[in-house]
A protein has these predicted regions:
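Active-site beta3 strand of CheY-like receiver
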Residues: 62-68
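Two-component/phosphorelay signaling modules centered on CheY-like receiver
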Residues: 28-47
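Receiver (REC) domain active-site loop signature in two-component systems and cognate sites
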Residues: 73
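C-terminal output helix
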Residues: 102-104, 118-131
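Conserved small/polar residues in nucleotide/adenosyl-binding loops
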Residues: 133-137
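Non-catalytic signal-transmission and effector/linker regions of two-component phosphorelay proteins
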Residues: 1-23, 29, 36
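Acidic catalytic/metal-coordinating carboxylates
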Residues: 50-51, 76-80
Length: 137
């Protein structure tokens, strides 16, 4: 069964929403706010960071959930943040965001453990489905 076809029970959804945190790491404030709004309206807990460095200093990776991570940001890139997460033993699922359809980069990120890749502008329904799937795993 493909991840997009995974069935989630209402009980699994309620448990995930009560215990999981979606971390949004993107340098675009308007996108962070929009993604947080979409998730908040569906009952998810979110926290946003404008830089990967802020994520590493401000987050508690022991709290379950996932990371929505922009590929290209000033300072530490999303790909560099993925490698840093791995070196620190942070095993949260990653959904990458990019405004650039770089297939080689996407393949490399998935091979390094990313769970999915979304192109900007983000399709809200696909974003919600991917978040639910990866948080519930």
């Amino acid at each position: 069964m493909r991840p997009s076809q995974k069935q989630i029970t209402p009980e699994q959804l309620a448990f995930a929403q009560a215990h999981a945190l979606v971390r949004i790491v993107d340098d675009q404030a308007d996108l962070r706010e929009a993604l947080s709004f979409v998730l908040d309206m569906e009952g998810w807990k979110t926290i946003s960071y404008g830089r990967a460095e802020d994520f590493f200093t401000g987050d508690s990776p022991s709290e379950p959930g996932c990371v929505v991570l922009d590929v290209r940001m000033p300072g530490m890139s999303g790909i560099e943040a993925q490698h840093e997460m791995r070196s620190r033993g942070i095993a949260l699922p990653i959904i990458f965001l990019t405004g650039h359809g770089d297939v080689d980069m996407a393949v490399g990120a998935v091979q390094d453990g990313a769970f999915d890749f979304l192109l900007k502008p983000v399709d809200n329904e696909r974003f919600l489905n991917l978040s639910l799937i990866h948080i519930s795993e």
